[in-house]
């Protein structure tokens, strides 16, 4: 997208929006956008690395899918969980997750929903009751009063949904939306529908939490031989918002860290493709914002 006259960047729908693999190839051939020196892989820091003075240590996890029992949680100040903390968003699962959060020693815990948190998506639940009663029987048989305020079960964290919070001077924004995939929660068509959500992200955000990846950063699905990240999310991150950290999950195969030299991109999916919770939490230190 172009720039408006007064300097504010406006993102428009990318011409390759609907085909992320083609978009990746196009931008690589024409701009080397996803190759060194523009981007490179980053090794996670060991857990016993001393935290530098004047820094805050973030611990990133995602896609724990109710399998939190065996996860070794490292030292840190702030926990970031990028969604899919349940299988279906059942209240019993949410309570179990909240209990797990309550036992963790982090000073702050920030959580967003993912496509598996079906009950958190009010539009999804309204449609499910009307149409596809047998697809998720355990969800369909919930009464509205069981799930209407399901996010209030998350008493041990800050829950973000198209909203932000300032913690230790860091502005953190969280959003659950992902490109349509088999009709799960918070799924939207690629293009304008998703861009409308990313346009809600204000400038001046230090840490962006989304459930899924942007195009080209830890979004490769080997068995499909496809990139699946959102092109509009990438353009929003790189051209408009420019956070220090963009943390996500959603694509279990994409676990790991990359940087474009300004933003660090972390896919913190804890579960593997076979839903084993064996990818370790990722620790990331950020210098505290100057209190100007």
PLM region spans:
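Core catalytic region of metal-dependent phosphoesterases/phosphodiesterases
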Residues: 61, 66-167
